[in-house]
Amino acid sequence: SRQATPPTFARYTPTNPFRDGQVQALGIYVQDDMHFGPLNVLAGLRHDRVKGKAASMNNGRVTTGLDRSDGATSASLGAVYEISPLLRPYLNVSRAFRAADLRERYQSGPRSDGFYYAGSPKISPETATQIELGLKGRDERLEYTASVYRSRINDYITGMELTGQAAVAACGQVNAAACKQNLNLGHVTLTGADAGLRWQAMSDHWLRASWSMVRGENDDLNEPLFQMPADRLALGWDWRLNGQWMLDADWTLVKRQKRVATRFTRGGEDPTPGYALVDVGATWQFAPQQSVRLAVRNVGDKRYHDHLAEGLTGREL
């Protein structure tokens, strides 16, 4: 008789970034909407308490020091003055608070960007002060908005690549070559502007336009903030043929993003070229609450890379 040797199977170890993680939030909010003739004032006050806890993280290796509670009071004050329906300047000043979510606190393991992330259960919440100045208006044929803003964020939450002994301590020797951990930057500043318009050029024809830009600064390192979107301009057209059919087309232009973080990423953030995309679509409204839509995105199948889309690191198979 013959006896065969049983096959050898690979043994896989389950990966559990964290277990029994919870983020509990309680907020109390009051608001008053006041009218003084053409002046409308909106004031709000809010207090939040946020508590995070987990039984373990990093595949059960860490079981202590995982609880954190935070609280903050935030407020906003806005005013709109209606000179006419088409001319309504406004100003808004606000103070905001954001605590880390479950993933930012506890997830310990590989992510889609190719890095192994170490959990940060004691990460501090963000607080931000923002001022916004704008203009808006609308009537039967025209609707528009335009604004500029500036926001200063303390304890900004972001992921940073670690090297050397810091990477070994956070991610272990096996994952030290591609290790990141969420941390707080002391101060960052966002300065931006955006605008939007919708205009009925003729019967059943509407033209649309929107534009946005933002400049982020890492005030700790005096360089551009990591992963800021490129300037974007979008132009669109809608044509309602009758009560059932509508055709639309969009042209999106994205500017080259050359403002990249070099010191923070150790040269890991690259500039991305600009691009232009064309989308077209048709919608058939065959019932009051039902419709069928056919659309072609990126006509011509143009190759492009959005700056906020993270590519592979080169360590994947």
Where in this protein do the model-derived segments appear?
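Membrane-embedded beta-barrel scaffold of Gram-negative outer-membrane proteins
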Residues: E82, R88-S94, K122-L185, T189-T191, ...
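Signature of Gram-negative outer-membrane beta-barrel scaffolds
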Residues: S1-R88, A99, P110
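Repeated loop/turn-to-beta-strand initiation elements of outer-membrane beta-barrel proteins
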Residues: P38-V41, L86-P89, R141-Y144, S203-L207, ...
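Residues on the lipid-exposed face of transmembrane beta-strands in outer-membrane beta-barrel proteins
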Residues: I28-M34, L77-Y81, I123, L133-G137, ...
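Transmembrane beta-strands of outer-membrane beta-barrel pores
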Residues: R2, F36-P38, H47-K53, V93-A99, ...
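Gram-negative outer-membrane beta-barrel transporters
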Residues: P38-V41, Y149-I153, G172-T262, G300
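C-terminal beta-signal and adjacent terminal beta-strands/loops
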Residues: F97-R98, R152-N154, G159, L253-A261, ...
